[in-house]
């Protein structure tokens, strides 16, 4: 198992109004360190052990295998090759992210990669996206070539890219044909398309407002462990309020399906003396 913190992810399927069919999964950061006691000393160790962990989790009945995505750090960063490998080695367990920082993404290329990973897995991808968590890089996304528009906040940038990604996943025309090559003028959608993927996109939310925004866009909700609107009440109550507002906003939109909601809790497995140290 990759070193470092893991989290359990629990969510309801939302398959029927008023019914909470709960599922449980794991969320791995995939840390690796070449230090005494480490069982994941390299990136290869972390990646391969994450695949093995997902296989083992499926065997014992765990419902989901999720990974964190952080850049410029010794942990998992590029999720789609990993998710595709997990999808090819498993048959039932859901696979996904919590979350992909959209500031670092080309939303159209990401739509291609997401569809490919979903098709490889047989439609098991549960993709969490968001603004991302605090990071060690200063303007890291700009190092990738993604510079926000003048006056655009990091959060607005992530939401704008998410909307482009959603349109592409839903099959919208995002380019035009070249009449000189095709003899026609028309729209082009990203290929491949994976039916049903659009209903399996989640937004990682740390505030009430972004949870309501997610509902307005038809996104499932990944409630963050870093809720930023501290009102003096215990965390579980604050999180419950966020989820209630999300469900209310979802109902007001009149979406045909029921949404899914997930929460996560940190777990430190202690099985040996070395773990205690």
Task: Locate each region found by the language model.
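A conserved active-site cap/scaffold subdomain adjacent to cofactor or substrate pockets
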Residues: 209-237
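Hydrophobic faces of well-ordered beta-strands that scaffold small-molecule active sites
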Residues: 24-28, 65-67, 94-98, 125-129, ...
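Active-site mouth loops of central-metabolism enzymes
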Residues: 32-48, 100-108, 195-205, 268
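Acidic (Asp/Glu)-rich catalytic clusters
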Residues: 18-19, 58-59, 83-92, 114, ...
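Acidic-and-aromatic substrate-binding clefts and catalytic sites of carbohydrate-active enzymes
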Residues: 71-78, 102-108, 229-234, 269-271
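Flexible, glycine-rich active-site loops centered on histidine and acidic residues
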Residues: 10, 19-43, 104-174, 229
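N-terminal beta1-alpha1-beta2 module of alpha/beta enzyme domains
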Residues: 2-93
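An alpha-helical appendage that flanks or caps ligand/catalytic pockets
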Residues: 2-20, 150-190, 223, 232-277
């Amino acid at each position: 198992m990759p070193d470092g913190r893991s989290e359990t992810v629990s969510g309801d399927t939302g398959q029927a109004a008023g019914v909470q069919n709960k599922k449980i999964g794991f969320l791995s950061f995939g840390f690796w360190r070449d230090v005494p006691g480490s069982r994941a000393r390299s990136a290869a160790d972390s990646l391969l052990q994450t695949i093995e962990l997902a296989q083992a989790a499926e065997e014992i009945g765990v419902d989901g295998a999720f990974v964190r995505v952080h850049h410029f750090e010794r942990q998992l960063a590029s999720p789609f090759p990993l998710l595709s490998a997990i999808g090819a080695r498993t048959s039932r367990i859901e696979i996904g992210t919590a979350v992909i920082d959209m500031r670092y993404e080309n939303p159209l290329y990401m739509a291609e990669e997401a569809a490919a990973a979903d098709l490889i897995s047989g439609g098991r991808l549960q993709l969490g996206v968001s603004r991302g968590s605090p990071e060690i890089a200063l303007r890291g996304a700009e190092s990738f070539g993604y510079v926000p528009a003048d006056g655009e906040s990091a959060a607005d940038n992530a939401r704008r890219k998410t909307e482009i990604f959603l349109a592409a996943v839903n099959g919208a025309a995002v380019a035009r044909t070249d009449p000189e090559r095709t003899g026609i003028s028309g729209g082009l959608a990203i290929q491949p398309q994976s039916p049903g993927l659009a209903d399996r996109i989640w937004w990682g939310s740390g505030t009430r407002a972004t949870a309501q925004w997610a509902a307005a866009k038809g996104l499932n909700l990944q409630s963050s462990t870093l809720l930023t609107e501290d009102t003096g009440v215990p965390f579980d109550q604050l999180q419950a309020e966020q989820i209630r507002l999300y469900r209310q906003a979802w109902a007001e939109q009149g979406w045909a399906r029921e949404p899914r909601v997930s929460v996560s809790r940190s777990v430190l497995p202690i099985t040996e003396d070395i773990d205690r140290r």
